[in-house]
Amino acid sequence: MMRPGMMQRRAAEAAGWGAALALALIAVAVVASTSSWLLYRDGDSVVVALMADSLRRGDSQDWALSPVLFLPETTVYAALSFLGLGTTGTLTLNAVVNLLAVYGGIRLVAGRSRPGSRPVTGSVLAFAAFVALVLLEGPDGMPGFHLALLTATTTYYSATVVGTLVTVGLFRRLLDGAPAVRVVPVMVGVVAISTLTNPLFVVWCVGPVAVTVGILLLGRRIVPRLAFVTLLAVAGAAAVGYLLRGFFAANIVAAGGNYLRPDQAGAALARLAGVLGDTVVSVNGLLWLAVVLALFATSVVVAVRSWRRRDGVVAAVCVLAVVAPLAATALVVVAGTDADRYLQPWVFLPVVVLAAAPPVRSVPRALSVILAGVLALAAVAAVPGTVAAASRPDADLACVTRWIDASGRTGAGQFWTVRAPKLALTDPSHLVQVDNTMRPYDWLVNRAERRGPVTFLIQDAATVPFAGVSTFDATPVRCGRYTILDFGSRVLPLGDPRN
């Protein structure tokens, strides 16, 4: 017979996951309604769906990828796609799964239930703060930072976010005294896979963990043996993961010079200042920044307080929550990049202070019941909106795919224009991804696709005028935001591929 204490803990865990599901549904409903292009149509966002569909069809595989390999993301999407929800339905469900995985990572960081502790309450509170940041960021396309809502996509590092949280949680378990023989193998696996699929994980997690262990060791808050085991596990696993990337060397076409431009550090700083300025011009943006900075400051305060109380476990979590965002910012500046998405640790790590060190006072039972009821009602109300957003027909896209399928011919278009049509086509090889000089653009695309004679072009507002292509004999076919330029029997020559 199950003991009352065990039943109570399981009920609390179930309630926590229920609250997390409700919050995730609310967040996805808002993202699907206000940022549907980012979720379903964006040129980068559809790569995981393209890869999973290609694998399911049994196509030959020769993908040209960025440094990110999308291995966990593709696995999750492919598994969810077997539910038969269609592309937008699967992407929507994937967004919910991503957010629930974030809650799971936060719950791991919160630690085990112990007398006097409320890890479930703290985890729900931390996840609610993360969801609040998603809601405050507003529609994609508005000026300012959009970091939290990226976790809802299959492309923008959701696996790296979750991998970082899980690694921090496992580190906390080691500090809590969990048997290393059980924790370390899992940690090694997570770190190796996370580094293999995205080397950014080293900056977000491996480096900050190493710095935190060093601080704990200098302050005598960790025994040397545990410090050595932790460093060996994360550093060794990261090295293994990075070496395994050698098997994908032919697929990683990104040049290092595109990502490391220290001579552009000044420009990167100026751009960060500009995006920060764009963020605070709206009330939502101002509130978003206030929440982010408040959580970061709270992490600093709790880290200092825990250090003085010789609570090395909570201090370690809070130090990590401070070091990782600073490391991410340093990377953006030193690399001279304009990729704001590298700054995501600012939105998913400082929130864990609410889980690692939840408020001392408990919420009155009556208020808890009221909050649970409101949350449940909001989640139920969010479902129809989410379903409507996921099933909303795209007449323009349907027009393009019908025309291409009926023609049986091959056309071409630029990256931001053809990605969504390629995903919607029965045979994506009927659209060749090119640049404005008609050279095949091998970026986040399967190079094994056949490239038949090109006899039409697709254009939209994002298309850069094609150089050297005369359109005087082309018949325009209007499909809303798209225009098909049909050249009939005239074949447009393609140049040498580039990436």
Annotated model-derived regions:
Residues 155-160, 203-204, 284-291, 315-321, ...:
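Hydrophobic/aromatic-rich transmembrane helices and adjacent perimembrane loops
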